[in-house]
A protein has these predicted regions:
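C-terminal binding/interaction regions
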Residues: 6-21, 100-156
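Mid-chain, well-packed structural core segment of small domains
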Residues: 74-120
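Short glycine-/acidic-enriched loop or helix-start segments at secondary-structure transitions
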Residues: 23-24, 83-85, 126-127
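Short, structured active-site "lid" loops
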Residues: 54-74
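Short, solvent-exposed amphipathic alpha-helices that sit
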Residues: 21-32
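A short beta-strand-loop structural module common to alpha/beta enzyme folds
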Residues: 37-49
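Short active-site oxyanion
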Residues: 10-11, 69-72, 91-93
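SAM-dependent methyltransferases
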Residues: 1-10, 33
Length: 156
């Protein structure tokens, strides 16, 4: 997380019914461990077995696209659907990560800005570790990573 200590980092978070419980638990964890975060919750705001992940995830992507958020965490049942939807928006680099290595490396090598997870795949303890890896990693601005990122950005 790179902002000065007096600047809040805006993190947008979303979930459908498959990730609602995990999202609510993560919000508590984030508020406690990362007080420098401004957490923007774009839903779901209550458990609804009939809600659809594209609605919440597209709102999450829009927040980042509009510059209202720096990073995002999108949760659905598997993380896959959220990843597909998030990547539809220009400037979004989303990936499903269910381990700490991928979460950190996704940021370090690819400047990933949206972490997608499956609420039916991982438990809260695993999710906390993965989220920490995602938030604490920084893009490595070596030539090869910058070159690759530029190629990715041209695909937008």
């Amino acid at each position: 997380m790179k902002k000065t200590t007096d600047q809040k980092i805006n993190l947008v978070i979303s979930a459908d019914h498959g990730g609602f419980e995990l999202k609510e638990n993560l919000k508590k964890f984030l508020a406690q461990k990362y007080p420098e975060l401004n957490i923007i919750d774009v839903g779901a705001y209550e458990f609804d077995a009939e809600d659809d992940f594209p609605d919440m995830t597209s709102e999450l992507s829009e927040e980042i696209y509009q510059g209202k958020a720096d990073k995002g965490i999108a949760i659905c049942g598997s993380g896959v659907g959220a990843s597909i939807v998030a990547n539809k928006k220009k400037g979004i680099r989303a990936a499903v990560c269910h381990d700490v290595y991928s979460a950190a490396q996704g940021v370090q090598h690819n400047n990933m800005n949206v972490l997608c997870m499956g609420g039916r795949v991982i438990n809260i303890s695993e999710a906390e570790n993965i989220v920490s890896s995602f938030l604490e990693a920084n893009f490595i601005s070596e030539n090869k990573y910058v070159r690759r990122l530029n190629k990715i950005n041209k695909l937008d």
